[in-house]
Structures are given as structure tokens and as C-alpha cells.
Amino acid sequence: MIKVLFICHGNICRSPMAEFVLKDIVEKRGLTSHFEIASAATSNEEIWNGTGNPVYPPAQAELRKHGIGKTVYTNFSEKRARQVTKEDYRYYDYLLCADANNIKNTIRITGQDVEGKVKLLLDFLADSERKGKSISDPWYSGRFDETYRDVVSGCEGLLAYLKETGRIS
């Protein structure tokens, strides 16, 4: 089982988009039994009285535009923001962040990354000008289409890496 946690600042835009994009891809490829996929925030800004906010409506719209959310596995209607924890570092194989600040804040919360689990999602791009870059935050840019494009590229790159390293076939 490959356990992937996507991380962004608030867990209402980039990281849930990545969570449900990867779920959609692995479901279409028949790989759901090989993965556990979730997402979390580095901040608690989207968590009120212990309850996280849902996926931001424009992020939901972008996912729906691409047919994501129609199956039980990809249904994001019950997804609520949550903050990353120390336990997440022990539990997940990959903690994939949207930007460098997310990496810094994840390590601040979880402790040193001695196992090399905390990375940028776009680190998995192969030979691309976007490799190792941040995924722009659509909360500020309004460009949910660009975020979606980067997330899909990162998820495809991750799957290619997992195939190359023999983790999936």
C-alpha cells in the first residue's frame, strides 16, 4: 500500500484538488487497492471549532469540469480541511507539498524529515520547466485551471516515478 498525503496551506484548494485528481487517475487505472490518498493543511485557518471547511467551491467546480467527483472513491462532498500532524509523518510514505512554504511548515509540525518523505509534488515532473516549482495558489490567482494542470502533471509524474521504482506495475 502506497500512502500519499498532499499538503497545502489551508487544505481547501491545491491539496484536495491533488487528492481527488490522484484518486481519479488511480481509479481509472484500476490501482485503488494499491493506494491510500488524503490531504491536509499546514495551517488551521480553515478549521473552525474543530470542523474543517469543505473544498473551496471554485476548486470543486474545476474538479467537476474534468468529471471528478462522480464515483464513491472520488466524491469530495464530505472532504473537510484538517491540519497535518506528527502522526502523519510516521503513517504516510509521501508528504507532497504544493510550495516551499508548505514544506517548511510541514517540517515545523512533524519534525525533521529524516526519511526524505516531504517533497514538492512538482519534484516528480520529468524534464519540465515546472519541475521543482511551486503550484500557484488559486485562492490568490483565481487560476484554478492552471492549478489543475500542474496537479495533473505532478500526479502523473508521481505515478511514473512509482512505476520506474517498481512500487506499481
Name every feature range the model reports, one short phrase each.
Residues 52-56, 99, 155:
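A structural signal for well-ordered alpha-helical scaffolds and beta->alpha junctions
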Residues 1-91, 160-169:
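Conserved active-site segments centered on acidic
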Residues 88-89, 94, 100-169:
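Phosphate-binding/catalytic loops
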